[in-house]
Curated annotation (Swiss-Prot):
The lineage of its organism: Bacteria, Bacillati, Cyanobacteriota, Cyanophyceae, Oscillatoriophycideae. It comes from Picosynechococcus sp. (strain ATCC 27264 / PCC 7002 / PR-6) (Agmenellum quadruplicatum). This is 4-hydroxy-3-methylbut-2-en-1-yl diphosphate synthase (ferredoxin). It holds the Pfam family GcpE. The gene is ispG. [4Fe-4S] cluster binds at residues 313, 316, 347, 354. Converts 2C-methyl-D-erythritol 2,4-cyclodiphosphate (ME-2,4cPP) into 1-hydroxy-2-methyl-2-(E)-butenyl 4-diphosphate. SUPFAM superfamilies: Nitrite and sulphite reductase 4Fe-4S domain-like.
Length: 406
């Protein structure tokens, strides 16, 4: 394969506000397509034991209904693998088809082969797929030993690859920084290089079997490691002429505000660089709470628009009304108008200029009076008490209002 040319940074590229995504192939996962010609896809994972058919179906449906486009389930045993057939059938019968990914770990060759019959994508971890017996007194691997284990991996992986290839299904090669195989640790260290080489070993096996429905992930719990691993993976794939999509995530990000910030620091940084085709925010919370974070990251970067974009200034001494309270009222009245940009600005000093890209603006004019804008044009001045109502009337007059869902 020929190397993929990466654009050289120039002055023009430094001031370019468009995110140029790394060119990747289209990989279908059920009825969803992942790749650079498609929107960045949002994923999550249910907490339920997949032996609980009803509970798993309900959990998958809950996630899908709030925007999770691909749902992953854990498959630790053959019994769990077989239950996926019932879960898929029950979803189709009572709801609709949802793309399902099976997560296979720990010497899971037979499990992966069984579950491949029932799901749309199988995720394997190169560090755990073939068990390597750790040796306490080992100090390294010879080339022959390294190659011998590589051949064992090929023998074990080939039936799964052939099954997925022949069914037109997908595989995620999901490397985790915390579970690199022993020989990778001895050879490359606990490094992004070791993560990349671990993925490349599996990719090459798949390519040799003419299987290319691959998605790659390089997850770590520390953001700097995760960033380095994905950047290096993208660089190496480009050099090798590989165009496989990347699944982004910071594993074990934690919960609350910091978990969200940590995930955004990793995922958002790479997306801004054009790296990444599907994302999962991993929080130690209910899976449903991951989905809004994903869509907020994508909206903030302009990669997907699934909600109203609110522009609002911080409060300062010039603010002519209670900005926080008014923003809350405006948001409450308009947050269903997906696709609009609405600005709420406290005064006319910076307001009109900083909200110029918004569709509509609500700007403090004088004490007790606000101005309503359509784009850069001031439409009317109204008493503050009528501001939100008149903003709605303006949107209605322009034919851009829809009633909120009941």
């Amino acid at each position: 394969m020929q190397a993929v040319e990466r654009p050289v940074q120039t002055t023009d590229s430094l001031v370019d506000t468009t995110i140029h995504r790394r060119k990747t192939r289209a990989v279908k996962v059920g009825n969803v397509t992942i790749g650079s010609d498609y929107p960045v896809v949002v994923q999550s994972m249910i907490n339920e034991d997949t032996l609980d058919i009803e509970g798993s179906v309900a959990a998958i449906r809950r996630l899908h209904e709030i925007g999770c486009e691909i749902v992953r389930v854990t498959v630790p045993s053959m019994a769990h693998a077989r239950s996926l057939a019932q879960i898929k059938a029950k979803l189709a019968e009572t709801y609709q088809a949802v793309p399902i990914v099976a997560d296979v770990h720990h010497n899971g060759m037979k499990i992966a082969l069984e579950v491949a019959k029932h799901v749309d994508k199988v995720r394997i971890n190169p560090g755990l797929y073939v068990f390597e017996q750790a040796s306490g007194d080992r100090t390294g691997y010879t080339e022959a030993e390294f190659a011998a284990i590589g051949e064992k991996i090929r023998e074990t992986l080939e039936p799964l690859v052939v099954s997925l290839r022949d069914q037109g299904k997908a595989m995620r090669i999901g490397v985790n920084h915390g579970s690199l195989a022993e020989r990778m640790l001895f050879t490359y260290g606990d490094t992004p290089e070791g993560m990349v080489e671990s993925a490349l070993e599996f990719i090459r096996i798949c390519q040799s079997l003419d299987f290319h429905n691959l998605i790659i992930s390089m997850k770590a719990s520390r953001v700097p490691v995760m960033l380095a691993a994905y950047r290096l993976m993208a660089k190496r794939m480009d050099e090798l002429g590989m165009d496989y999509p990347l699944h982004l995530g910071v594993t074990e990000a934690g919960d609350g505000e910091y978990g969200r910030i940590k995930s955004t620091a990793g995922i958002g940084t790479l997306l801004a660089e054009g790296i990444g085709d599907t994302i999962r925010v991993s929080l130690t919370e209910a899976p449903e709470k991951e989905i809004p974070v994903c869509y907020s990251i994508l909206q903030a970067l302009g990669l997907r628009k699934t909600m109203v974009e609110y522009v609002a200034c911080p409060s300062c001494g010039r603010t002519l009304f209670n900005l926080e309270e008014v923003l809350h009222k405006v948001r409450e009245a308009t947050n269903h108008l997906t696709g609009l940009d609405i600005a709420v600005m406290g005064c006319i000093v910076n307001g009109p200029g900083e909200m110029a890209d918004a569709d509509y603006g609500y700007v403090g004019k004088t004490p007790g009076v606000i101005s309503l804008y359509r784009g850069r044009e001031e439409i009317r001045k109204v008493p503050e008490a009528q501001g939100v109502e008149e903003l709605i009337n303006l949107i209605k007059a322009d034919g851009r209002w829809v009633d909120p869902p009941q």
